[in-house]
């Protein structure tokens, strides 16, 4: 399902006054059915009350879809409604918060604006804070998106980012980067970074569970014999560690994982080999 323009939709002034052309940052005029850039002439439709700043069709996610909770700390910040928050990649939030603009590339239950995080359709220095949870691994150019966030934040504005490090492939094909701490700091090097730490939802135990679940799911999808699936599930961390330390032969199930189809191996591979030629 994709959106189509609705000429009888209006934008509230509180939202319209935040918006700018994503291409040139020019002022936008009009509010019934479409917005027009007064500088470059770009035209952007309003669909069901939501300004659309993408050129391609936009999918509508069923209203009953609910994304993962933000967690008490960030929900309390939004509940207080202090200052204006931009929530990038908000997904299907459990509730709508005042003074929070939900930004997405699909239309979810509370989406306010549709666009591209690499070219935010907002004026300079209008937000007091930005939340971006589990977004940056899905961006083609994280450094550019970071620069855009910095542009739309007020001086002293706050940023909270959660992003992947050791995570299997998810939301394919738009999972581009898993970043080390050094990588995350590089993306946001123009900010005054206060800390870059492992939050509770990214602890090693969660990572281990995510990887193990992905491996077992890949075996099931491959149609591997139940004996092979059970063999892998029954191995211990100690067996794999001893193998890595080159003290023992491969654990039971090693060959079953080695025999997975290439597309299934890509979900949780240690790395990739690329071969190319100059075109």
What are these regions (language model features)?
Residues 135-138, 201:
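Short beta->alpha junction loops/turns
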Residues 125, 140-144:
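Short N-terminal helix/helix-N-cap motif within the alpha/beta-hydrolase-1
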Residues 94-96, 140, 169:
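Glycine/Thr-rich phosphate-binding loops of Rossmann-like dinucleotide-binding domains
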Residues 2-125, 129-133, 252-257, 265-273, ...:
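Conserved N-terminal segment of class I S-adenosyl-L-methionine
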Residues 143-144, 148, 154, 158-279:
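S-adenosyl-L-methionine-dependent methyltransferase catalytic module, highlighting the catalytic core
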Residues 133-136, 162:
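Residues lining the SAM
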Residues 22, 128-131, 150, 185, ...:
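Short, surface-exposed helix/turn micro-motifs that flank interaction/cofactor sites
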Residues 42, 119, 137, 167, ...:
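Active-site micro-motifs of SAM-dependent methyltransferase domains
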């Amino acid at each position: 399902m994709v959106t189509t323009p609705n000429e009888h939709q209006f934008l509230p002034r509180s939202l319209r006054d935040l918006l700018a052309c994503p291409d040139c940052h020019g002022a936008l005029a009009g509010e019934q059915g479409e917005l027009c850039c007064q500088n470059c002439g770009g035209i952007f439709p309003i669909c069901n009350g939501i300004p659309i700043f993408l050129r391609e069709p936009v999918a509508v996610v069923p209203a009953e879809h609910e994304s993962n909770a933000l967690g008490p700390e960030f929900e309390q910040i939004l509940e207080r409604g202090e200052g204006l928050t931009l929530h990038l990649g908000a997904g299907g939030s459990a509730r709508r918060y005042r003074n929070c603009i939900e930004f997405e590339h699909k239309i979810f239950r509370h989406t306010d604006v549709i666009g591209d995080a690499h070219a935010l359709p907002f004026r300079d220095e209008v937000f007091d804070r930005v939340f971006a949870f589990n977004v940056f691994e899905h961006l083609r150019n994280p450094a550019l998106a970071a620069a855009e966030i910095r542009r739309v934040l007020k001086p002293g504005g706050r940023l909270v980012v959660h992003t992947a490090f050791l995570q299997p492939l998810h939301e394919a094909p738009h999972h581009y980067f898993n970043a080390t701490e050094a990588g995350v700091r590089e993306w946001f090097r123009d900010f005054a970074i206060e800390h870059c730490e492992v939050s509770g939802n990214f602890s090693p135990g969660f990572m281990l569970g995510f990887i193990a679940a992905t491996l077992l799911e890949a075996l099931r999808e491959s149609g591997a014999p139940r004996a092979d699936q059970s063999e892998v599930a029954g191995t211990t961390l100690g067996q794999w560690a001893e193998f890595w330390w080159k003290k023992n032969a491969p654990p039971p199930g090693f060959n079953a994982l080695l025999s997975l189809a290439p597309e299934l191996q890509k979900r949780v591979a240690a790395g990739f080999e690329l071969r190319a030629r100059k075109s």
